[in-house]
UniProtKB/Swiss-Prot annotation:
Region (Disordered): 1-53, 84-105
Keyword Nucleotide-binding: yes
Gene3D superfamilies: 1.10.8.60, Nucleic acid-binding proteins (2.40.50.140), P-loop containing nucleotide triphosphate hydrolases (3.40.50.300)
Ranges of biased composition (kind: Basic and acidic residues): 14-26, 86-103
Gly residues bias spans: 1-13
Entry keywords, A to Z: ATP-binding, Cytoplasm, Nucleotide-binding, Nucleus, Proteasome
A GO molecular-function annotation: ATP binding
SMART domains: AAA (SM00382)
This protein's name: 26S proteasome regulatory subunit 4
Length: 440
């Protein structure tokens, strides 16, 4: 029995055990999630660019950029259309402003009336209006003083600069740069008048110590009066030629200005320039244009003329001493002048210029005929001895007319007959030939 059981586990039972050993448990293969990963094929596959699939994202980006480009083109076209739709006036104004910015804007000139503080002032323009304006920060405040000329912005009138040379151009023109050619030798007669004007004007400028030793003050000014053509202006020219002083010549009518206050301002400028360039002589011809007697007037122009004369009175005899400034006035209507203008202290000497006498007439004829070619029969005694009221200018006109008569007949010498005819023609035109009031 025992052998039979053990025999049951013999060679047949060993085969079944081998089969059991081969059928061991193995876990299931895990399920793959996602795409199947491709196997790389070494370093060659790593160097190649990856394939992008699909192409949908790149195309969407391209379409988006194209749409943005279309929007930008539409905006550019819209702006261009808006520019073209602008009014022509606005476009021209914009272009004009650009040109002004490129070449600079003009500046107006005004007068500083009063300084309020460091940044504000009151200025006046040429039309007479006053403005409260600001002073820009770059303006030199040390140069600002009341009465100086300043540069103003043409829009807001702000002070943007200071004019260093604030001399009025009208006063600059009055100053004689070249001395006249006339001398005392060209004046016939008038010896007393020449002596008086030398004592009053020329000697105080050249030798003021003489008056200091005498203990007297030299005259401030003189007035030359007399009929027209007697040599008043000629004597003033001779004084300008004889002295080396600055000579300022002005006609009374030039001191009458259009705008209110310009006349007195011009008088102040005239004497200020004369004092700066001293010693100097101020010659005011035809002073009766502004120096007439004052009266109550309703006219604004007449009141302005009177204010100009009052400023002249102040300059002649004010608190400030004139120093080396001498004044010469000339008029042929001294009776119409205001007494305050020609009183002692302002005009200390009055020099009269009468019509020439026989001796003076002879001297004047000799001066005007010295350069003329005269015939042998010329005798001027008849012309000199005549009782006609001839002035120095009349004698010069007679000599000139005689020379023209000789030229008319193609002669190079002036005869005595030419002088007679020229005198007759001149006197006829002076007295009877020209109706009174023809040229008024």
């Amino acid at each position: 029995m025992g052998q039979s059981q053990s025999g049951g586990h013999g060679p047949g039972g060993g085969k079944k055990d081998d089969k059991d050993k081969k059928k061991k448990y193995e876990p299931p293969v895990p399920t793959r999630v996602g795409k199947k990963k491709k196997k790389t094929k070494g370093p060659d596959a790593a160097s190649k660019p990856p394939l992008v699939t699909p192409h949908t994202q790149c195309r969407l980006k391209l379409l988006k950029l194209e749409r943005i480009k279309d929007y930008l083109l539409m905006e550019e076209e819209f702006i261009r259309n808006q520019e073209q739709m602008k009014p022509l006036e606005e476009k021209q104004e914009e272009e004009r402003s650009k040109v002004d910015d490129l070449r600079g804007t003009p500046m107006s000139v005004g007068t500083l009336e009063e300084i309020i503080d460091d940044n504000h002032a009151i200025v006046s323009t040429s039309v007479g209006s006053e403005h409260y304006v600001s002073i820009l920060s770059f303006v030199d405040k040390d140069l600002l003083e009341p009465g100086c000329s300043v540069l103003l912005n043409h829009k807001v009138h702000a002070v943007i600069g200071v004019l260093m040379d604030d001399t009025d151009p009208l006063v600059t023109v009055m100053k004689l740069e070249k001395a006249p050619q006339e001398t005392y030798a060209d004046i016939g007669g008038l010896d007393n008048q020449i002596q008086e004007i030398k004592e009053s004007v020329e000697l105080p400028l050249t030798h003021p110590e003489y008056y200091e030793e005498m203990g007297i003050k030299p005259p401030k000014g003189v007035i030359l009066y007399g009929p027209p053509g007697t040599g008043k202006t000629l004597l003033a020219k001779a004084v300008a030629n004889q002295t080396s002083a600055t000579f300022l010549r002005v006609v009374g009518s030039e001191l009458i200005q259009k705008y209110l206050g310009d006349g007195p301002k011009l008088v102040r400028e005239l004497f200020r320039v004369a004092e700066e360039h001293g010693p100097s002589i101020v010659f005011i011809d035809e002073i009766d244009a502004i120096g007439t007697k004052r009266y109550d007037s309703n006219s604004g122009g007449e009141r302005e003329i009177q204010r100009t004369m009052l400023e002249l009175l102040n300059q002649l005899d004010g608190f400030d001493s004139r120093g080396d400034v001498k004044v010469i006035m000339a008029t042929n209507r001294i009776e119409t002048l205001d007494p305050a203008l020609i009183r002692p202290g302002r005009i200390d000497r009055k020099i009269e210029f009468p019509l020439p006498d026989e001796k003076t007439k002879k001297r004047i004829f000799q001066i005007h005929t010295s350069r003329m070619t005269l015939a042998d029969d010329v005798t001027l005694d008849e012309l000199i001895m005549a009782k006609d009221d001839l002035s120095g200018a009349d004698i010069k006109a007679i000599c000139t007319e005689a020379g023209l008569m000789a030229l008319r007949e193609r002669r190079m010498k002036v005869t005595n007959e030419d002088f007679k005819k020229s005198k007759e023609n001149f006197l006829y035109k002076k007295t009877e030939g020209t109706p009174e009031g023809l040229y008024l």
